[in-house]
Amino acid sequence: FVIHLLNCSDGGVVSARPNQIKEELKIEDKAFGIYGSIVQVGRIIGTLSVMILLNFFNRKYLIFSALCLKSSTFLIYFVTKNYPIIMVFRFLQGFSHVFTYVYFPTWVHQFGLQKYKTVMTSFIQTASPFGSVFGFNATTFLGAFNYGFALLAFTILGLNLILLFMPDEYFSPSIFFYKNVTEEHEGRESTYSLFEVDEEKMKQKQAEKSKKPEGPSIWLQLLRPVFATIVLARTVIMFSFMGLHYWIGDYFENALGQDGKFAKASIYSLVSLLGPFLGSMTGAAICECFGGYTKKHSSLLCFVFSILTGISAIFTPMVDSLTYFTILLFLFFFFANCMMPILIGISFNCVDKKIKGASSGVNSLMCTFLGNLPAPSVYGFINAKYKDSNKRLAMTLNLNYIWVNTVLCFANYFFRLKEKTEEELRE
């Protein structure tokens, strides 16, 4: 968990000292935006290759190598300030990040105690927001972004050495399974391999599948307006979140004139942790009160939350008071995250069970391509062009982009209502 947390901390380091990074690398807002987006490109390429590499190479040494590579990308700032070279290492930083991000939750699922798996999986997912806050706070108090990166690099390397001395079986589910499966009535190791068990299960599943009627094709389901509008709605939220997280430090210093360590650290910690957590819990609870995300009214609930998020977005860039800014930003995160569990639930509910994995992959890929990837660069280009006349314009547009989500949530409600009516007419 600690390694996973540190692996997710680099975004917080960049957010804490944006102006310092621009000065050290001698770049402007446009280049700084691309500096953020290139990491997402690395993550996309890493995601496409990680599962292949994990299946063909020793997992322990692969994870060890990925963490060593990640640490080296943090230390490059002590060697050179050349922007093109830094960008290559930023790409590698995103590429190496994926290995632990993908494998550690899988490791918990394979080796975690059965009755604690859900808790352990949820716990390890908190590493991402906590890591971002840790990186932000550590860099804020250290005073320099390269010191923040150095702290992450040497801490990860130290913990990485511990992984190196762990037995291989802790990284390979097949070895672990083979060594520990026993036949109770004989008290000896089972002679059945994973492949034999999987083959038997596969035959059973194929027999069950042959009895079921064929449903709509995968692409027809993924291109349905109900699914497409939900995916795009999540993409809009991820775009606003990414732009906000990446540029929040710049906004603190240049628009609000706040460079105090305590103010920046406390506000970022509050809105980044408490807002999303309380929002997700509240949204899920309210949705359950209205019958859950399987009901068409859940889309209308997202529409209401989206309007409340949009109202917060309108006023957040208008205020100068740090207190009011904190309250409004908290409300923005709170109401936006009220939608997230409902949107995820609807996206799973509107496709057949057999393609839920494919729908999840499409959902994640779209959020990265249309949300996380372009957000830092788009914000940077707007900020570079208009910051002399309006330092808050980029943040205003980034936050109010959430109104597109409002339109999509209403459209989703309309399409679900239409499908329900068509089903009733057919019956």
Please give the residue ranges for each predicted region:
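Residue-level signature of mid-helix packing/kink "hotspots" within the transmembrane helices
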Residues: 12, 39-48, 98, 132-133, ...
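Extracytoplasmic
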Residues: 2-29, 244-249, 375
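Conserved MFS/SLC helix-loop-helix module at the cytosolic interface between two early adjacent transmembrane helices
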Residues: 45-83
